[in-house]
């Protein structure tokens, strides 16, 4: 079983990181091409392209300028310890054991606008480049055109290496769109998390993101290998609704109350 999640805009490069045998990102030759484009952009152009403040644009212009093809423990940190955000709050990597993290290294991947696909212990330098960014490049008008089938092929390789064909899509639509799902030799399971607020079950973004992280945590801690095992997920009050689910879309519901 291989799970995929989105990255996060919020990054942490300050806190301590446990000692692991780190890995190198696989697609840095592509990352370098994107960095070369981004280095040509002024802070004002970055602000416009990414719809961010001038202050954030200045920070990210500096990050692009500082980015190096050589990733080491002085200029980078393992991706799973760098990303912070709702999904990663649910995952809560700081409380996972070393064995859990090593399991995740085989069974979890993070999609990325700059790096394409990351393993948890892949070194990553600070950046901001969301997959939906309309960054013109030699292959087209945006990052979907740039990555083409590269992410899909790398994902297939990861699926093959971990031993089965089950892919659990816990990524946002923006990032999953970079995966050419029809090209994968995989059974793709999509968990959906609905919260009952005011008498109606619906996707509430903040809760759904955190739940996707919780599902990752559940897969990792319980060493799941079968799709059916996902249905037993019950963290944070969620329960599997068989009637609302389909063969490959697993619906989990939770009652928040009024």
Swiss-Prot record:
Which GO biological-process labels does this protein carry?
response to hydroperoxide
What is the organism of origin for this protein? Answer: Mannheimia succiniciproducens (strain KCTC 0769BP / MBEL55E)
Spell out the protein name for this chain: UPF0246 protein MS0374
Kindly give the Pfam families that the UniProt entry links to this protein.
H2O2_YaaD (PF03883)
Could you name the Gene Ontology cellular component terms for this entry?
cytosol
* Stated family: Belongs to the UPF0246 family.
Q: Which HAMAP family match?
A: UPF0246 (MF_00652)
Q: Which residues form a coiled coil?
A: none
């Amino acid at each position: 079983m291989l799970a995929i999640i989105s990255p996060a805009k919020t990054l942490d490069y300050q806190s301590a990181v446990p000692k692991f045998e780190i890995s190198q990102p696989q697609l840095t030759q592509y990352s370098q091409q994107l960095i070369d484009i981004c280095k040509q952009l002024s802070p004002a152009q970055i602000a416009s392209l990414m719809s961010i403040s001038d202050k954030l644009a200045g920070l990210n212009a500096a990050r692009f300028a500082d980015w190096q093809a050589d990733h080491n423990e002085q200029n980078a940190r393992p991706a799973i310890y760098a990303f912070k955000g709702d999904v990663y709050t649910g995952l809560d990597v700081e409380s996972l054991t070393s064995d859990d993290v090593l399991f995740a290294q085989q069974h979890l991947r993070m999609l990325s606008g700059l790096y394409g696909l990351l393993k948890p212990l892949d070194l990553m330098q600070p950046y901001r480049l969301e997959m939906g960014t309309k960054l013109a490049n030699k292959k087209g008008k945006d990052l979907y055109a740039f990555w083409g089938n590269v992410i899909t092929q790398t994902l297939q390789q990861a699926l093959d290496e971990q031993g089965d064909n089950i892919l659990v899509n816990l990524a946002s639509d923006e990032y999953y769109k970079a995966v050419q799902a029809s090209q994968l030799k995989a059974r793709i399971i999509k968990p959906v998390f609905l919260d009952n607020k005011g008498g109606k079950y619906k996707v509430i973004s903040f809760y759904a993101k955190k739940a996707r992280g919780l599902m990752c945590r559940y897969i990792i801690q319980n060493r799941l290998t079968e799709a059916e095992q996902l249905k037993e997920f019950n963290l944070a009050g969620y329960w599997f609704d068989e009637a609302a689910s389909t063969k490959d879309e697993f619906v989990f519901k939770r009652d928040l109350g009024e």
